[in-house]
Swiss-Prot record:
Protein name: C5a anaphylatoxin chemotactic receptor 1
Subcellular location field: Cell membrane; Cytoplasmic vesicle
Chain segments annotated as transmembrane: 31-57, 63-86, 104-125, 147-167, 194-219, 236-258, 276-296
Gene3D superfamilies recorded: Rhodopsin 7-helix transmembrane proteins
Disulfide bonds, paired cysteine numbers: 102-181
Involved in C5a binding: annotated span: 14-23
GO function terms (MF aspect): complement component C5a receptor activity; G protein-coupled receptor activity
Organism of provenance: Macaca mulatta
Length: 340
C-alpha cells in the first residue's frame, strides 16, 4: 500500500499506485524522521514557549518583540502538532483521527510552517529598512505597522494552505487495513502542478531571495562603514540564509518533482519513501532561527554568565539598533544642513 499519510500538499491518493509490500515495517527514513520529530518537539516547545513568555510579559513592547512573538507562536503551534505526525508514522501512516481532522490538522501544520517562513522574511526586510532608511523608520515604523505586516504574513500563509484544506480526504485501504489521509487532485494534473509551483515560489523562492538580498546588503553596509568587521555579523548572515536553504530545499524539490511524475513511476515511489524525512527536515527550521540569533549574537562567556530569559530580552530589545539608526539619522541631517 502506498504511504499517503504525510501532512503536506504533495500527498496524492491514487488507486493505481502499486502495492508496497514493505509497509508493515518502518523504513530507515521514517525512523530518522521520528528521531528528528522527537528532538524538535522537546527543544521547540520549550524554547518557543519561553520566547512567547518573554516577549509577551517581560520584554519591552518593541517592534522586535512583535516580530519574535509572532514567529514563536507559529513555531510553537507547529511543534505542538508533531505528536500527530509521530503517531501516524509509528502506525505505518494510518490516520486514526477522522475525516474532519484530516482536513483541519494537516492544514494547520502547513499554515504555521508557512507563517514561520514569511515572518522570517518580514523580519529581514524590517532590519534592512532600519539600516538603509532610518529617517522613514523614525517617522512611520511603529507597532501598528508591525502588526499589519504580521497579519499580511499570516494571511499569505493561509492562502498557501487553502489547497490542502480543500482537496484533503481520507481513504480506507484493506491490504493491510488502514485509513490514509492525503490530498486528492483527481485526474487534474495541471492543478496539482500549479499548486506545487505556487508553493515553491511563494513559500520558498521569494522568502529565500528576500533573506539573501536583505542580509547581503546589510553585510555590505556594515563592511563599508568599517563598523564591525568581526565574524559575528557574518555568522548570523550565513547561518540564517543557509539554514533556510538547507532545511527547506529537500521538501520543495521533492514536492515539485512528484507533481510532474506519475504515481506509479519508480522515482515517485522512491520520493514517497523519503517524504517523512523531508518534512522532518523542514521542521528543524521552525525552531532554529531564534537560537541562531542568540548564539551568534553573544560571546560564549557572555552566554554562560546570562540566563536564557536575559539573553532573549537582549535579542528582542531594539536599543542597539535604535541607537545606530538615530546616530545615522543625525549624521545625515547634519550633512544635509552643511550642504545647504
Amino acid at each position: 500500500t502506498p504511504d499517503y499519510g504525510h501532512y503536506d500538499d504533495k500527498d496524492t491518493l491514487d488507486a493505481n499506485t502499486p502495492v508496497d509490500k514493505t509497509s508493515n515495517t518502518l523504513r530507515v527514513p521514517d525512523i530518522l524522521a521520528l528521531v528528528i520529530f522527537a528532538v524538535v518537539f522537546l527543544v521547540g516547545v520549550l524554547r518557543n514557549a519561553l520566547v512567547v513568555w518573554v516577549t509577551a510579559f517581560e520584554a519591552k513592547r518593541t517592534i522586535n518583540a512583535i516580530w519574535f512573538l509572532n514567529l514563536a507562536v507559529a513555531d510553537f503551534l507547529s511543534c505542538l502538532a508533531l505528536p500527530i505526525l509521530f503517531t501516524s508514522i509509528v502506525q505505518h501512516h494510518h490516520w486514526p483521527f477522522g475525516g474532519a481532522a484530516c482536513r483541519i490538522l494537516p492544514s494547520l501544520i502547513l499554515l504555521n510552517m508557512y507563517a514561520s517562513i514569511l515572518l522570517l522574511a518580514t523580519i529581514s526586510a524590517d532590519r534592512f529598512l532600519l539600516v538603509f532608511n532610518p529617517i522613514w523608520c523614525q517617522n512611520f515604523r511603529g507597532a501598528g505597522l508591525a502588526w499589519i505586516a504580521c497579519a499580511v504574513a499570516w494571511g499569505l500563509a493561509l492562502l498557501l494552505t487553502i489547497p490542502s484544506f480543500l482537496y484533503r480526504v481520507v481513504r480506507e485501504e484493506y491490504f493491510p487495513p488502514k485509513v490514509l489521509c492525503g490530498v486528492d487532485h483527481g485526474h487534474d494534473k495541471r492543478r496539482e502542478r500549479a499548486v506545487a509551483i505556487a508553493r515553491l515560489v511563494l513559500g520558498f523562492v521569494w522568502p529565500l531571495l528576500t533573506l539573501t538580498m536583505c542580509y547581503t546588503f546589510l553585510l555590505l553596509r556594515t563592511w563599508s562603514r568599517r563598523a564591525t568587521r568581526s565574524t559575528k555579523t557574518l555568522k548570523v548572515v550565513v547561518a540564517v540564509v543557509a539554514s533556510f536553504f538547507i532545511f527547506w530545499l529537500p521538501y520543495q524539490v521533492t514536492g515539485m518533482m512528484m507533481s510532474f511524475l506519475e504515481p506509479s513511476s519508480p522515482t515517485f515511489l522512491l520520493l514517497k519513501k523519503l517524504d517523512s524525512l523531508c518534512i522532518s527536515f523542514a521542521y528543524i527550521n521552525c525552531c532554529i532561527n531564534p537560537i541562531i540569533y542568540v548564539v551568534a549574537g553573544q560571546g560564549f562567556q557572555g552566554r554562560l554568565r546570562k540566563s536564557l530569559p536575559s539573553l532573549l530580552r537582549n535579542v528582542l530589545t531594539e536599543e542597539s539598533m535604535v541607537r545606530e539608526s538615530k546616530s545615522f539619522t543625525r549624521s545625515t541631517v547634519d550633512t544635509m544642513a552643511q550642504k545647504t
